[in-house]
UniProtKB/Swiss-Prot annotation:
Gene3D superfamilies tied to this protein: 1.10.1750.10, 1.10.8.60, 3.30.300.180, P-loop containing nucleotide triphosphate hydrolases
Name of a matching Pfam family: Bac_DnaA_C
Primary site of residence: cytoplasm
Chain residue ranges for the region called Domain III, AAA+ region: 103-320
Source organism (scientific name): Desulforamulus reducens (strain ATCC BAA-1160 / DSM 100696 / MI-1) (Desulfotomaculum reducens)
Higher taxonomy: Bacteria, Bacillati, Bacillota, Clostridia, Eubacteriales
Entry comment, domain topic: Domain I is involved in oligomerization and binding regulators, domain II is flexibile and of varying length in different bacteria, domain III forms the AAA+ region, while domain IV binds dsDNA.
GO cellular component: a single term: plasma membrane
MF terms in GO: ATP binding; ATP hydrolysis activity; DNA replication origin binding; lipid binding
Protein name (database record): Chromosomal replication initiator protein DnaA
């Protein structure tokens, strides 16, 4: 099998050459090679620290996808420096009942997580759950925007539990993978095996639960899995890009169960936290060519999420090294100009607002214009009307016309309701804040 994996690198390269530009392909991909394969992990050798970081952050997903499509099995990747020995783990003793563990990212631990005002509560709750599974908060529901560290905390919980409770069975899975496994089990008449796998876990971490919306069969299956684990006093940790009550087509019985435990959110990091994140990333990746003033510049200019922040650091460091130029703030401005360059003011229209709100709640624009009065549609419609009044110069009658020809009093009622709710609902406050951010991007 190992020789087969190594031999297929040429096939992988052929696929990758079609997906990236010629300069990137020759700079990054032709200079690395697979050197070992064990435990479903392909070890890829790279020439230096910069290549290691760049490949891991930018190209790992497409390399993994190419290998999996060729090999027809799931694999993981690990990048090592040229000349570095490959430490093959010794097989662990297993009990007679096999433990199922979905591979956790070794980078995502509590030690590598930077705590700030934007994530302090979520971090504390995650650590409490890791230290006392099923005794602190069950379930733990973590929500926040893309790239803010939810998955990092999920993996950190898994790592901590496994390090301190080796006999516990831990499963990390995305809702998309859970759905695909369910579909495959139905196709192959193996639903019993599928259920036994997840319902025998001690710890279940399920990421991006919002992707279960509109998937009725998957929601049904997860409902029973949740009940089985909860009644057996097993720990459940869930992440989402929004709180349970904002997942429009989520079944009420699932929503209520998610609200049984603790719900905590993660916000965009403030300036001080962004600086700390960049310094931690530089330390972990052995990046020594970025001075403090350049770190400060990047932290000031990249405010969206942690993923883009760390990507900017790697990009500046790699460019500085390859071009043999000092990593000054001026160089950073040059390298990141496509990310931070000032753009023309965006024209905000009602259709843009409706599309953004519809996407957020898992609806269609037609739903917002229709006569449906169910809460799963009526509330998002009221939010969209409120934003239309806040962000455009349209009159109430004009806004009503945009929403399927509704009367101006309907628009006024919607705006008044959302305004009133905002005064006492912190979750709605964050939702409006997030929607305004998406509309303005």
């Amino acid at each position: 099998m190992q020789n087969d994996v190594l031999a297929r690198w040429e096939q992988v390269l052929i696929r990758l050459e079609k997906q990236v530009n010629k300069h990137s392909f020759e700079t990054w991909l032709t200079k690395c090679k697979p050197v070992a394969f064990y435990d479903n992990t392909i070890i890829i050798e790279v020439p230096d620290h910069f290549s290691k970081s760049w490949l891991a952050d930018r190209y790992a997903p497409i390399i993994k996808q190419a290998y999996e499509s060729i090999m027809h099995q799931e694999i993981s990747l690990q990048f090592i420096l040229a000349g570095q020995e490959v430490d093959q783990p010794k097989p662990k003793e297993r009990s007679s009942e096999e433990t199922y563990i979905n591979i956790l990212n070794p980078r995502y631990t509590f030690d590598t997580f930077v705590v700030g005002n934007s994530n302090r509560f979520a971090h504390a709750a995650s650590l409490a759950v890791a230290e006392s599974p099923a005794k602190a908060y069950n379930p733990l529901f973590i929500y926040g925007g893309v790239g803010l560290g939810k998955t990092h905390l999920m993996h950190a919980i898994g790592h901590y539990i496994l390090e301190n409770n080796q006999n516990l069975k831990v499963a990390y899975v995305t809702s998309e993978k859970f759905t695909n496994e369910l579909i495959n089990s139905i196709r192959d008449d193996q639903t019993v095996e599928f259920r036994n796998k997840y319902r025998s876990m001690d710890i279940l971490l399920i990421d991006d639960i919002q992707f279960l919306e509109k998937k009725e069969r998957t929601q049904e299956e997860f409902f029973h899995t949740f009940n089985t684990l909860y009644e057996a006093n097993k720990q459940i940790i869930i992440s989402s890009d929004r709180p349970p009550k904002e997942i429009a087509t989520l079944e009420d019985r699932l929503r209520s169960r998610f609200e049984w435990g603790l719900i905590t959110d993660m916000q965009s990091p403030d300036y001080e936290t962004r600086v700390a994140i960049l310094r931690k990333k530089a330390q972990l990746e052995a990046i020594k060519n970025i001075p403090d003033e350049t770190i400060a510049y990047i932290a000031d200019k990249i405010q969206s999420n942690i993923r883009e922040l760390e990507g900017a650091l790697i990009r500046v460091s790699a460019f500085s090294s390859l071009e043999q130029r000092d990593a000054t703030p001026q160089l950073a401005a040059e390298v990141l100009k496509d990310v931070i360059a000032p753009s023309k003011p965006k024209i905000i229209t009602t259709p843009l607002i409706m599309q953004t709100v519809a996407d957020f709640y898992g609806l269609r624009i037609e739903d917002l214009k229709a006569k449906k009065r169910t809460r799963s549609v009526a509330f998002p419609r009221q939010v969209a009307m409120y934003l239309a009044r806040e962000l455009t110069d349209l009159s109430l009658p004009k806004i009503g016309d945009e929403f399927g020809g509704r009367d101006h009093t309907t628009v006024l009622h919607a705006c008044d309701k959302i305004t009133t709710d905002l005064s006492s609902d912190p979750v709605l406050q964050e939702t409006i804040k997030e929607l305004k951010k998406r509309i303005g991007e």
